[in-house]
Amino acid sequence: MNGDLYQELKKRISGEVRFDKVSRFLYSTDASIYEIEPIGVVIPRTHEDVFAVMEITRDFGVPLLPRGAGTSLAGQTVGEAVVVDMSKYLNRVLEVNTEERWALVEPGVVQEQLNLHLKPMGYLFGPDTSTANRATLGGMMGNNSAGSHSIVYGKTIDHVLETHVVLASGEQRVFKDMSFEEAAQMSGIEGRISDIVANNREEIDRRFPRIQRRVSGYNLDEFVRGKKFNLSKLIVGSEGTLAAVHQARVRIEPRPAAVALCVIHFKELVESIRATDIILPFNPSAIELVDDLILSLARGSLELSRQMDFIDGTPAAILLVEFYGENEAELRSKIESLEAALKREKFGYSYVRAFDAAEQTRIWKLRKAGLGLLLGMKGERKPIAFVEDCAVEPSKLAKFLVRFQEVIAKYDTTAGYYGHASVGCLHIRPLINTKSRREIQVMKDMTDDITDLVLEFNGSMSGEHGDGLARSHLNERLFGHQIYKAFQDVKLAFDPHSRMNPGKIVNGPPMTENLRYGEKYSTVFVNTHYDFSREGGLATAVELCNGAAVCRKQNEGTMCPSYMVTKEDEHSTRGRANYMREILSGKTGIEEFSGQKLHDALDLCLECKGCKAECPSNVDMAKLKYEFLAHYNEAHGTPLRSKLFAGIHNLSRIASIWPAMANTMMARPIVRQALDKYLGIDARRKLPPIAPQTFESWFRKRSRPPKATTANPAGKVILFHDTFIDFNYPEIGKATTTLLEAAGYEVAISERQCCGRPMISKGLPEEARANAAFNVGKLAPFVEQGYSIVGCEPSCILTFRDEYPDLLKGHAVDAVAKASFLLEEFIVREKKEGRWKLDLKRQTTKALIHGHCHEKALIGSRFLKETMALAYTVEEIDSGCCGMAGSFGFEKEHYDISMAIGQRRLFPAVEKQPDAIVVAPGVSCRQQVEHATGRKALHPAEALVLAL
């Protein structure tokens, strides 16, 4: 049947229809602990496609599951159904009416995209989940999402005015406000829902908790306590079980005039919750909890650790308390009054204020990363989502927390704590190993205990994360038999054959079925070329991906450049990790780990390392790709082009013997066309020139070899002259030498080989290991003599720190890694230590700076900013990846996507400011800027030497 279904869908749908094994793998998980392989995937391009897929699945009698970004935490978006992915094409803001304060949107619109669209108009969409940079409006409606500011804006249900839906029958409907009397007179769904409400009115009023945060079950309370009859109130929070939304009208709110944050530090977790009783009367716009477990994990995150200077000491918990106001003076007054009240009652030990928008964004980033940080914990026990979304009346929250902790202690485990203290909804995640039969039983027993506790406190098992596979089985117990029967009647009214996302909200399976990592889960051993002990092994490195989908963000940072252009989950970090996990768990043959399908999935990975820093779980897809390519080359042979790119150092060395001839040859159209045709090196790319004199030749003719000792060890530098500095751009090495010597440093060079980066990138780890061993052997003695190793090319010098320890072991490699610095990092370090005393002349020209991906991931861009600020007014381009990525952009099959990545943000920013100089440490970045815009970008050393 599936073959006929596939053919019918292909025939009638203009979008994409995918029933292949890889696509089914990619959509078998979300951000929950569950995994169910779907029948197939449809990606509608138009509204008509949505109508057609509903009709076709109806005719074939198969289930259907609407899906957005797949960030659901309770398993709402996985199931044995045809998954309809609304996120790729149906993502337009169709209309905005600021006078009437509404926006008409398609379901795939990302929350952050909508707010960016509304920002110039002075409006926003109120509910703001921590997944705002990838969660879709359709998903938020399905889940009835809320977020950090629900104390002001409520839940999504409070902002949906009208829904355009398709029912399981294929019927198209528009649901909007009408009177209860009108609904009661209607036949069809309106009349049936009116009858259900009338027959259960008293029980609904009695059994639904009177708290702001309750999304469990169907929203029948809206028809008892609400003023209008609107079936959109049932669609919202229905998790796709009633209908598919293809368009919606949502309310928008005026943006606050001014915003401020106060970060309150506490010595005890419970103390922080008790403090909310004092904070709430000051009318904050948010009160968010972050516990010490998340803070400690953040300190181990490459990106977040660089942004935690607002944390004072080692608190057991912090509260982020936010206020809206008309101006900063009003906000200062509010915060001062709050601090005085807290101090009177002896709550908190430190109060950090943030009035600057950039500083607030930095602080909020920590809170939003809480989920991913927790799931990135090492070890088999993970702080998983199953009882993580309980909500009670805020005044009862402290007592509820203490009782919850008693339950956790009963089962001999711990938990991570974060969430929305303002509205009594805490995300408490007990650590459970779902690969253990005993702990799966613990998960079930603990759920029973917590359900009893929630009922005792008249709360909700879900304040915003929904029922899904994790909690649907609890709804009869939570609401009673009569209301549960009413829920089943609602389902029948909309979907009599139970085709819409079955098994959610009603008739749910046991919570311990369909676990992604269950007691039978195991992995196949793979003998690796790189050391994965830091990650806990290859399989564990893959399993770090929890599905939170931060890699689907589109408007900021580096991760994930290929997804930002393709909008394909397959080309996101999550998609690639999912497929690797399927292979390593034995669901396909292990030969797939060196197979073509995985090669295709990894092909567009630029090895930028953005995920290593920006993924809260620190998934290092670049390293995983290096490992895969090594196995792929072993199985299939290394392509000639890969060998040539990997051997760029030796090729350049040979070309440098006859530089003029080499340049003439490379410039000839016939040669470039031949490279294009036979090697796939795109003829549209300009190959780097061979310099008339190598940097090493220049350097050795103008200096003596370094002495073994010196009076000032801190002032001795080995300049690692990488391949491009030596053979292509010696002016950068000359500028670096001039700059360092002007600052009083003794500069020397050492015998060396290529850093190994090109070999690593092309899947040749043994060749890279040999080069690493040679370089460490030559450089370690200098380190012992007090030399610092300074490099100009981020991807080269940072290889010493990131990859060498995975290729080699021993004191020498650790010492070399510790002593290696990027030029701008070295300058900032030396200045901080008081050793850099060189004064540079202020320049009138602005410097637009673009950091290299590896630099931004491994050390951050602040060193580049601080160094360039010594002489220039600096503006950092939030440009993400430039798209070149070493040889990637030179490869014919990658040229278009390479340019598309750069065109997203980098190229327009460069072209917008023709009077500014462009500064980029990475050779690939400078090449990309020149090829795309015609402008020559400078290395930081070249720009700084102009200011001597």
Roles of regions detected by a PLM:
Residues 1-59, 69-101, 130, 153, ...:
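N-terminal flexible segment immediately upstream of the FAD-binding catalytic core
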Residues 9, 32-64, 82, 86-129, ...:
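N-terminal glycine-rich flavin-associated loop
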Residues 23-26, 72-75, 131-137, 212-219, ...:
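A glycine-rich phosphate-binding loop feature that marks nucleotide/adenosyl-phosphate handling sites
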Residues 32, 140-142, 150-153, 160-366, ...:
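C-terminal substrate-binding/cap subdomain adjacent to the FAD-binding core in PCMH-type
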Residues 223-242, 249, 255, 260, ...:
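Long hydrophobic segments that form regular secondary structure
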Residues 248-250, 282-381, 415, 419-421, ...:
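Terminal amphipathic helices with adjacent charged low-complexity linkers/tails
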Residues 381, 456-461, 468-604, 627-637, ...:
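Ferredoxin-type iron-sulfur electron-transfer modules and their immediate structural context
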Residues 495, 502, 517, 622-948:
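Iron-sulfur cluster-binding electron-transfer modules in prokaryotic oxidoreductases
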